[in-house]
């Protein structure tokens, strides 16, 4: 544990009282996740497909598409995943309503669930418009489209209030004699990666017009790009908002880490008030490394 950013002497740790108010504060803190959650839509457009219904109705994709999604993260069984503290982004975790499997990626500070359209149930008889798929993917701020259609993918193919960023992947391996150059092998596959943004949104990420990416680097590159785009879309919503039927709507953006910090500060403030201690704003003391190190030794106060 670190005392950053409070390097200076801050006094002994505060004992949390056992009164109902303080215990409710601890309970509220326990309910806040320790990582940030993200959900990204994944679509496959087969040759000749252009409409929303055609694309959402796909149950499989090309070999390159399968290799791509299988390297985005690890495959997880949805049923029973709630007990493993897995974030499913709204996918059913009990009755396989939204499919049996999905892909998940996580590290120490974030967790991404991918809403993969080809892994969700397709029912042409009972759900010809694939509304069960769209209720999830249509609410994702960022969608990744593996475009094998042979045509340009229109931004509003899946229209919706939360359609902010589309990341388009197109197979682009040169025909005939492959490119030659440093790092390029004769059996390398290449993909053109481009981005579409909602009107009014500034450009985000390193793409520019587009980037050519090898197949081996594609999953990690697109995953990182979609993560940054999803964070940016949330900040954009908080600062600018979006036009809806009710007028301009704004959604506050706050990371789970920030929410936990706010809850800790609130709990600390209540404890100090209960002890009759006034909070006094004072100028920051010069950094004392010895004192900073000593402040990390919590056992010294026991």
Please tell me what each predicted stretch does.
Residues 1-302:
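Long, non-globular regulatory segments flanking folded domains
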